[in-house]
Amino acid sequence: MPQHDQLHRYLFENFAVRGELVTVSETLQQILENHDYPQPVKNVLAELLVATSLLTATLKFDGDITVQLQGDGPMSLAVINGNNNQQMRGVARVQGEIPENADLKTLVGNGYVVITITPSEGERYQGVVGLEGDTLAACLEDYFMRSEQLPTRLFIRTGDVDGKPAAGGMLLQVMPAQNAQQDDFDHLATLTETIKTEELLTLPANEVLWRLYHEEEVTVYDPQDVEFKCTCSRERCADALKTLPDEEVDSILAEDGEIDMHCDYCGNHYLFNAMDIAEIRNNASPADPQVH
């Protein structure tokens, strides 16, 4: 049966290696439900969601991570944003025809992966790696080796459970300031690579970990729920309107009678009429009509 969207952290007692396991279904469905994406794009967003959840769980502070693919292919952008509370949102932009069996490079074309880490306090960090690997997991493994010099492996699977999209993934990483033997890490990676999609998406995390590592000593920590959550708001839209030239705003009002701001992530609409705009310009809070 399908599992609740959760992330599990675990630690190998005899190796300086830590791991994570995440499965998502409801969160993925909510990201996809307001859009009519082709199946290959849905698959990429599913992989991005899993990857972002796994990467966000590596944060040692409050903040968020955005993982995005950009390129000159028919899928010009795919992005997932998540925070340390495992609250996720995402969107893709598609232009042109996409073959049913399109792989990552066909979708993105000449492109790159951008990882943006934004602490709640402190400076933002951004890393960029070229889309050189055949998979998103390979590109992110390259990112970890370049940016943090930490051997890292990601294992991402996508599929369907009870006819609904689902995805899961696992991460193995040598712990910082530890001297894990490469042979040990490779051994654990080889075990992890044997995980079947059906097992990862349908079995409880503890059973997955036992099947993979029953000959190892593994400590599993309390799970963390993963959920869809959009951070859009009427106030943020009002702040965005403040940055536009008055002439542009007035022109839209004259033509349409109101300004309709649409959130690509969740599908919400925020409507502003002439009175709302006047209040915004006077630094007052506009009324709060919202259309779903």
UniProtKB/Swiss-Prot annotation:
One GO process term, biological-process aspect: protein refolding
SUPFAM superfamilies the record matches: Hsp33 domain, HSP33 redox switch-like
Matches recorded under InterPro entries: Heat_shock_Hsp33, Heat_shock_Hsp33_C, Heat_shock_Hsp33_N, Hsp33_helix_hairpin_bin_dom_sf
Signal peptide range in chain numbering: none
Disulfide bonds: C230-C232, C263-C266
Keywords per UniProt: Chaperone, Cytoplasm, Disulfide bond, Redox-active center, Stress response, Zinc
Localization in the cell: Cytoplasm
UniProt PTM: Under oxidizing conditions two disulfide bonds are formed involving the reactive cysteines. Under reducing conditions zinc is bound to the reactive cysteines and the protein is inactive.
Single GO MF descriptor: protein folding chaperone
Source species, domain of life: Bacteria
Record-level GO cellular component terms: cytoplasm
Cited function: Redox regulated molecular chaperone. Protects both thermally unfolding and oxidatively damaged proteins from irreversible aggregation. Plays an important role in the bacterial defense system toward oxidative stress.
PANTHER family per UniProt: 33 KDA CHAPERONIN
Family membership: Belongs to the HSP33 family.
HAMAP family: HslO
Record's protein name: 33 kDa chaperonin
Gene: hslO
